[in-house]
């Protein structure tokens, strides 16, 4: 009887670890392609890659973001607008001009959709050289694709969950990209510290950004938007994504552009 209890306890721990590992892979996999491809490539073009590698990266972004897939074109254009209009009425997402997290994210969703479907006119400076694979984007952004991924996630939870409380983790999987957006675009403009004086409210959320792979160094990024390295101003600001990019540059998969030297902090 005692051995049976130990066995059941051990099995429940293993199953919980499988679920957590699944969520961790989706969290950091989706986040990596968001910051590496959508942000630092599509929006800021801090490096170059071949057309073949670009297409492979489109597909990998879809694989890891799944039902949360974000278009490089929609994201890249909207993010350029965010930098141009940061914390003004034209900013696609700003805590200063939105009542709460939900209203900000709803507005962001609508603007992103209108940009991606080219339903609104956008200045050429925001669209210049932003990568676009329209046929693939139309498929990856479709409700068929999103529903298929959602069913796959549901099936995983149906097979592995052993307690009702574990289903509380299911919405995290379905809403992972919006959660990433809230952390940076809401909390990253309210909490944290600054290295540089700025006209906007951008903050560095973490001393070591273990959660957002460098995205949390938001104040640094707003000061040096053309730099592929979001960290490096203080000794503890290690940008994990940039370290991976250096490795990809070393083996020839991408080619980092010369970036300006990081200035010493002003604050």
List PLM regions with ranges.
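Non-catalytic, topology-defining segments of multipass membrane proteins
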Residues: 1-183, 217, 226-267
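Glycine-rich, pocket-lining loop/helix-strand segments that form or immediately flank
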Residues: 186
């Amino acid at each position: 009887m005692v051995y049976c209890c130990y066995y059941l306890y051990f099995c429940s721990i293993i199953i919980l670890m499988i679920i957590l590992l699944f969520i961790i892979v989706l969290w950091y996999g989706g986040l990596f392609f968001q910051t590496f491809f959508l942000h630092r490539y599509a929006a800021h073009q801090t490096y170059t890659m071949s057309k073949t590698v670009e297409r492979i990266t489109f597909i990998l972004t879809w694989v890891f973001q799944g039902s949360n897939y974000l278009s490089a074109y929609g994201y890249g254009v909207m993010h350029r607008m965010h930098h141009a209009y940061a914390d003004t009425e034209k900013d696609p997402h700003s805590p200063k001009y939105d009542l709460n997290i939900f209203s900000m994210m709803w507005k962001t969703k609508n603007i992103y959709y209108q940009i991606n479907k080219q339903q609104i006119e956008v200045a050429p400076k925001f669209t210049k050289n932003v990568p676009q694979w329209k046929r693939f984007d139309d498929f990856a952004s479709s409700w068929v694709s999103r529903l298929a991924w959602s069913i796959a996630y549901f099936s995983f939870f149906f097979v592995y969950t052993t307690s009702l409380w574990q289903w509380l983790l299911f919405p995290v999987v379905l809403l992972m990209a919006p959660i990433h957006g809230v952390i940076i675009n809401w909390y990253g403009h309210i909490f944290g510290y600054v290295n540089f004086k700025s006209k906007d409210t951008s903050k560095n959320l973490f001393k070591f950004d273990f959660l957002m792979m460098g995205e949390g160094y938001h104040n640094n990024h707003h000061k040096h938007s053309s730099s592929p390295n979001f960290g490096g101003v203080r000794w503890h600001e290690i940008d994990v994504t940039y370290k991976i990019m250096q490795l990809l540059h070393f083996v020839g998969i991408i080619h980092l552009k010369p970036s300006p030297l990081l200035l010493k902090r002003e604050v």
